[in-house]
Amino acid sequence: MSSKTVTPMMAQYLEIKQDHADALLFYRMGDFYEMFFDDAVEAAAALDIALTKRGKHDDADIPMCGVPVHAAEGYLLTLIRKGFRVAVCEQMEDPAEAKKRGSKSVVRREVVRLVTPGTLTEASLLEARRHNYLAAFAKVRDDSALAWVDISTGEFRVMACPAARLSVDLARLAPREVLLAEGNDLRSLVEEHEAAATELGRASFDSTAAVDRLCRLYGVADLEAFGSFERADLSAMGAIVGYLELTQKGKLPLLRKPVKERAQHGLQIDAATRRNLELTQSLSGGREGALLTVIDRTVTAQGARLLARRLASPSADLSIIRTRHEGVRYALEAPEILDTVRTALRQVPDMDRALSRLALDRGGPRDLAAIRNGLAQAATLAEALPDDALPPLWAQSKSRFFGHDALRDLLEKALIAEPPLLTRDGGFVASGYNVDLDEARQLRDEGRGVIAGMQAEYAEATGIASLKVKHNNVLGYFIETTATHADKMLSPPLSDRFIHRQTTANAVRFTTVELSEMETRILNAGGRALALEKSIFEELRQAVIVAAAELSDCARALAELDVVTALAVLARDEDWCAPKVDDSRAFEISGGRHPVVEAALRASGTPFIRNDCDLSEGAAPIWLLTGPNMAGKSTFLRQNALIAILAQMGSYVPATAARIGLVAQVFSRVGASDDLARGRSTFMVEMVETAAILNQAGDRALVILDEIGRGTATYDGLSIAWATLEHLHGVNRCRALFATHYHEMTGLAAQLSGVENATVAVKEHDGDVIFLHEVRRGAADRSYGVQVAKLAGLPPSVVARAREVLKTLESGERSGGNPAKALLEDLPLFANAAPPPPPAAPTSALEARLADISPDALSPREALDLVYELKSLADRD
């Protein structure tokens, strides 16, 4: 786009825009960020704001739209969520400075930041209880790695990640943005995980340049002290640091030293299993109904993020798991300490994100106050926790609360209790902290008092009681009176003292020599006070940055205590037990419950039926579960997988007792739907997920499979389910729960030593089925599908016909004939005519009341009351 025919300002805009062609340019003009040309058209549509015009270019109007600077963050969030990148261009000098270079000089402007989904730091742009990860995937020869960072908290990690595993780790981390080398074929995979895919030149992934970037970031000569990293690790980490240099324009965040994770140290959960188990979000995509929402009792933002990370990445390291369980047990056994810690934690702000904003020079007085308040509560906890008898997790956390007294005292002396959000507002430094500031404030405030006195004196001198001394940004201080009284002040002798400044429609404005002099004194004092406060803020900010590493450790310790005490409160309130996790192959659950379903049932006043599960080697590591739909098979499958995950994240579990041999992988194939975008039917999705399980599950895996083979013809489905179970038993040799409606498979329990039949119990009454939700040893005799269909509300004629068809099919199978042919030959004469519904049988009040009763839902007291009620109805009839 040519800049020859545009104004100097527009020429500057075009030059800056040329360097940021892939982003919307927020171009600062006074109190607004303006956008022009195509940026304006796109932004106006995305933000639903007015599209106007400003000047012409090549004889065409230039489209323009803008947003106020003070409200820009809200608009930024909308644009980022809609997939845009935004380059923020600020005025780097005052317009008065530009005018000194000539009347046509343009204010100097620079892009100070490139805002992308993975580089957000402002509180208003982030979810407080969720990480905001920026990830990078790098491949060097045969090795590949995934690195990720949250610049709002400083977390920085990397791990080896074969391309085949990338989907698993993207599902675990849920990054907002992923950096890829140009020319890759992974964009669609990244976008499937609802992350923005950003392609960079291959030079950005150069591992040699990465070492230089990392050494420069941490101020070290080499990276040996950080551990051993492969070239692919360095490539991924270097791409992230280079991208941060690009987007933050030289103001790099405070990143912790990179930590190398190892896949074998974590419980592996693939994307389909995470989705099916609804760990962090429900199948509908929201938080309601997810396991995380049900178990979250944290009271700090950093604690909530740590809990979410633990649930997404449970441990497979016995020592870590046991240390966490020991920490929860200590909290439960010391209720007074538990209450003290929780009380203190409720007053802890988000120190991590405050620290990050201060490091990037985007912070304000409230971020300093967040550091101060967090350190104050850390000191409270350091004093409250005993010096001995603390388990390792608690002792390590306490050790990080010391050594901050000097910084805490400095911030407590320097800041008022509730400082404003922005530095430019001033008024955040406490009185008595700085003598020069106190003097400037006194002069400023006294000057304002003098102004009030001058107004009274002017009113008396002129005899105009309504006279006012006012202020605006254009005239400064001025005297205002109505037009009615203006003639008096414009005439001698008052005109000798009162100098006319401005006439408006309703008033006339004046000034005096002494008012102008006082205005200068006030402005100078106010400006000096604000300048001093800004200088003090910078001194305090630097003091915080110097202590950043120790402050980050302190914040992590507070988060650790928040998580361990939150899990203790959860266990206490929900009656959860301490699981025993060891290196055996045991899986013994007594009285297990599904935490999310139990919470939902409690809300409706319905009790949850507890069930046992034993997949230990001494019993049978595979249970073949049969029973009708709606009986609770899927709930039983899921609850046992959730119990394993909760145990290995360090939580107590919803059971009366639990012993779990370490689980290395959890796989789930429950429920399916079409994948239209990739041309996959429900059955194809089911087969792909089943194939992944059979190909990947090791002997320490826990597998739950629900109704394999249901999406195809009966014998095809039975064959696939049969072969799948045999493979799990003979090849994978893992612990598994296998639910099916193929009752023919129950005979496998007699042939395969590691398979045992189990069923969900039901009762029949007058042709109806009653679900007991109890899992028992043995096989179901049938699936009760027709009864469930009746409960679902199918028309009576359809239910009646279904019973006839079922009877014919079952009798035909027993006789060895062709039941389907018999059905076709015996179609009703008027098959298309719906038979009239049977006449409703007259019912008495007693019969109607009996029909409404759900016996399993009655408490003993309710049952006794019901007996008296039924006796009364019987006597009446």
Curated annotation (Swiss-Prot):
GO BP, sorted A to Z: mismatch repair
Annotated keywords: ATP-binding, DNA damage, DNA repair, DNA-binding, Nucleotide-binding
Entry keyword Hydrolase: no
The organism's place on the tree of life at top rank: Bacteria
Pfam families in UniProt: MutS_I, MutS_II, MutS_III, MutS_IV, MutS_V
GO MF annotations in UniProt: ATP binding; ATP-dependent DNA damage sensor activity; damaged DNA binding; mismatched DNA binding
Protein name per its UniProtKB record: DNA mismatch repair protein MutS
Originating species: Dinoroseobacter shibae (strain DSM 16493 / NCIMB 14021 / DFL 12)
Record lineage: Bacteria, Pseudomonadati, Pseudomonadota, Alphaproteobacteria, Rhodobacterales
